[in-house]
Design a protein with these regions (language model features):
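Cytochrome P450 heme-binding "Cys pocket" and the immediately downstream C-terminal segment
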Residues: 87-124
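Active-site-adjacent bridging/hinge elements
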Residues: 66-75
Length: 136
């Protein structure tokens, strides 16, 4: 739940590009085949219409009890035929690494930390991420 919520708020990519393979009607919009479409992952993952009024807040319980959302609402590793082939390995490795680190260390956010996510090619902390680390 914690990793899923982290990936929702801070996806590894800001957007994915896709080429429309056939003419599509999306609501009142006609999208011809060959059109390049950018799917803004970070904006969809922060959409209050999908995630609720607290969409900007870290809430791992969004994913509790196997709760899921519409396929197009959560896609930190992309979507469709070009989805990241390493997503399952990444999640397993992240869970193992996080468990090993949390068994040995405690973390606190530094008083000097300023939360300011910045969109470049990826989502990055504008002023760094000052963390106080203490061995357990």
């Amino acid at each position: 739940m914690v990793l899923k919520e982290t990936l929702r708020l801070y996806p590894p990519a800001l957007f994915v590009n896709r080429t429309v393979t056939r003419d599509v009607k999306l609501g009142k919009l006609d999208i011809p085949a060959g059109t390049q479409v950018n799917l803004p992952i970070v904006h969809i993952h922060h959409d209050v219409d999908i995630w609720g009024a607290n969409a900007e807040e870290f809430d791992p319980l969004r994913f509790a009890d196997g709760k899921s959302y519409h396929l197009g609402a959560y896609f930190p590793f992309g979507i469709g035929p070009a989805i990241c082939v390493g997503q399952n390995l990444t999640m397993v490795e992240a869970k193992l690494a996080l468990a090993m680190v949390l068994q040995r260390f405690a973390f606190d956010v530094s008083p000097s930390y300023v939360h300011a996510p910045m969109m470049v090619m990826t989502l990055q902390p504008q002023y760094g991420a000052q963390v106080l680390v203490r061995k357990i």
